[in-house]
Amino acid sequence: VYKRQSLYFMNLDKTKNEIIETAEKIFADTECGKVFRIKGFLMDDDDKWMELNVTHQEMRLEPITEGQKVVIVIGENLNEQRIGTFFA
């Protein structure tokens, strides 16, 4: 029996495009575990806050007024060490 997990990655020094590419790579890598969703907040190229929501079906980026630099990976049997290498 697997339990749902959440892994938090704070204060990432990555661009919007780098975070999007990282999310796609994590979903594609089965060694990361069973990833359901990646969500978080990031700044775009114009220093405006964006909310990120990624699932296997869709990726959404929406503007928001405030946020903090965090990406959360949600799933089961997550390999924290493997996922962490994508954010290094």
List the model feature ranges, each with a label.
Residues 49, 53-88:
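Generic C-terminus detector
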Residues 8-14, 44, 73-77:
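Short beta-strand-to-loop capping motifs
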Residues 12-14, 23-30, 35:
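Polybasic interaction patches
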